[in-house]
From Swiss-Prot:
PROSITE patterns: 4FE4S_FER_1, 4FE4S_FER_2
InterPro entries in the record: 4Fe4S_Fe-S-bd, 4Fe4S_Fe_S_CS, PSI_iron-sulfur_center, PSI_PsaC
Keyword NAD: no
UniProt-recorded name of the protein: Photosystem I iron-sulfur center
NCBIfam families registered for this protein in UniProt: PS_I_psaC (TIGR03048)
Gene Ontology, cellular component aspect: chloroplast thylakoid membrane; photosystem I
Length: 81
């Protein structure tokens, strides 16, 4: 089962989500659009286990996790979009 990680533009570059992820799905990349000049990115979504630790640590609710089976969304993980 794959999980998709959606990054929103409210990231403040605090790195809380990156440090919370047990499977290193997230990383910080340079970004001119936020105060910290970096934003979370999810280059390894195939490693996401859907634990949502990143979501719970985020102070701005900037990301969400959805569960996918194949190419089709089968259920959301109780998040508002």
């Amino acid at each position: 089962m794959a999980h998709a990680v959606k990054i929103y533009d409210t990231c403040i570059g605090c790195t809380q989500c990156v440090r919370a992820c047990p499977t290193d799905v997230l990383e910080m990349i340079p970004w001119d659009g936020c105060k910290a000049n970096q934003i979370a990115s999810a280059p390894r979504t195939e490693d996401c286990v859907g634990c949502k630790r990143c979501e719970s640590r985020c102070p701005t609710d900037f990301l969400s996790v959805r569960v996918y089976l194949g190419n089709e969304t089968t259920r959301s993980m109780g998040l508002s979009y």
